[in-house]
């Protein structure tokens, strides 16, 4: 998003555009995409699998989408090229499910180090807490991965969003005329 437009953005900044204005336009555009995608996924999943906690599931979908979107925007803002940003973002998104613990339990030695960075874990773990009690108990019985309370999950996903936005601002603010 940013890495591919770096040369144009630098010219605009030279002409007087503030980094916050550029970031604001990106955040507005991407927020609309996050909302549309999250509502679509929620409608699709809730239609076929209504197991309770609809609003909670929607909020976790929105936060997970926003976290990944804004972290990838941050990567694009600090990357040297669009290719580098794309590759790093693909790896980040691609490793979310295997490292979340939702499919396979991670070794305890690795889990504590990796878990704070995996948005998919926080959305999944928090979303599980909103299931109907019989479904929640059934899921809990087959899981090897520990679940975290929903409030903690909301906070961590909010921190992911904030870190992505902060990295984006830092990357946009820094001049890179060598391009």
Where are these regions (language model features)?
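Membrane-spanning alpha-helical segments of multipass transporters and channels
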Residues: 1-179
């Amino acid at each position: 998003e940013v890495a591919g437009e770096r040369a144009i953005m630098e010219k605009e900044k030279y002409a007087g555009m503030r980094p916050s204005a550029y970031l604001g336009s990106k955040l507005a555009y991407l927020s609309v995409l996050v909302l549309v995608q999250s509502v679509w996924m929620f409608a699709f999943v809730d239609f076929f699998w209504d197991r309770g906690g609809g609003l909670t599931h929607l909020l976790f979908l929105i936060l997970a989408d926003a976290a990944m979107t804004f972290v990838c925007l941050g990567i694009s803002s600090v990357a040297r090229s669009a290719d580098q940003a794309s590759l790093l973002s693909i790896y980040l998104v691609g490793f979310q499910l295997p490292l979340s613990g939702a499919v396979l339990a991670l070794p305890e030695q690795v889990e504590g180090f990796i878990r704070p960075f995996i948005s998919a874990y926080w959305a999944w773990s928090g979303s599980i807490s909103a299931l109907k009690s019989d479904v929640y108990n059934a899921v809990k019985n087959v899981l090897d991965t520990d679940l975290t309370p929903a409030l903690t999950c909301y906070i961590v996903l909010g921190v992911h969003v904030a870190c992505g936005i902060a990295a984006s601002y830092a990357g946009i603010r820094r001049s890179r005329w060598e391009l």
